[in-house]
Amino acid sequence: MMQKNLTFPLMMLYLVPWGIQCIIGNFMPVYVASLPFATEKTVGEVVALGAVITMISQVVWTKFADKSKNKNNVLVLSLILLAAFSGLFLIEGITKPILFIFVILFYSCYMTHQPLIETIAYENYSATKHSFAWFRSFASFGYAFIGLLITVLPKDNPKNFFIYSGILAILAVGITKMVPSKNIETIKTVTEKKGIYNKAYILFLVLTFMFYFCSSITATFFPVYYTAKEGIGGSVGIYSLMVSVSTFLEWGIMIVFSKTLEKMKAKHKFFIMGISGIFRSGIIFLVENQYLILLSFLFQGIWYGLLWSSVTPYIKKIVPENCLASAQGAWTVVSAGLATFAGTYAGGIIADVIGLKMLFMIISVVLIFATGLSIVLVKKE
């Protein structure tokens, strides 16, 4: 009975919130760019500010969950706040200072679900017949599915994206209530640093910074460039469809080629990943046809498929077993925090000076340099 009762809620607990990540990650830049006062620099500032607030809020919320008797209630609170703060962006006539205030409030609870859901699912999955990894895969599926769903939903007004995120947040509240709470302390902060910051790990963080610096710029400014009239002038619906196709490709790479990827050396995987990034940004820079430029999503799928199948196994090889959580956390701060902040902020400034199109040429050059360095920065196996 428990198997039948929990399988569907745990699946949906991943699928729905990661759908929110699809919406905000891809279309927050489109919304900001639609505001009358916004420039490319404004888009970069908003995404960079969101990255900083996300880093801070994750620490605060997980510590709060540690001290709470019921992690499910903490997740519910964060989702209710997320739904409420989504409504702020529906207000007419907001100014730039007000936008930044709304962004701070929104990102203070955005992405909070990720560590909390990982913990709640881990506490409950053993009551089903499925593995933890099986449930975790529905995060990628949810991201892709919602991206596909957006193609048939009204999207002419960028404010609609926040209506959708609010609806999904409320839906996630109901799903959370279907999952039993367990008072098990599974979110732990590993404070032991000895052995983490060895040469191999430091060099990997340097490579991570360079790769994410470039990928964050592409993720932030390509949707703006593709949908803007002064850019490619493409459809938001087509862009959303290709986000889904790319994510399904990413998922497929991890499933179909899992055994092959396990046998490949890390430096080869990161080198191929870098090459795919070069093709991705190079196509965006060189191609102006609104359909041919979508070939860049093929290389985006390869990029992320290799990334998510390579990072954790490689970290396990270069840091002590008792430091894995701390090492993974530091990697996340560099990738999702520092590199994303630096990339989006710098990208906005550069785009204001030389234009969006030339921005992707610069990314290609940086990626050529980073890809070459990957041969040196990734430890021999």
Model-based region annotation:
Residues 15, 85, 95-114, 209, ...:
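Hydrophobic core of transmembrane alpha-helices in multi-pass small-molecule transporters
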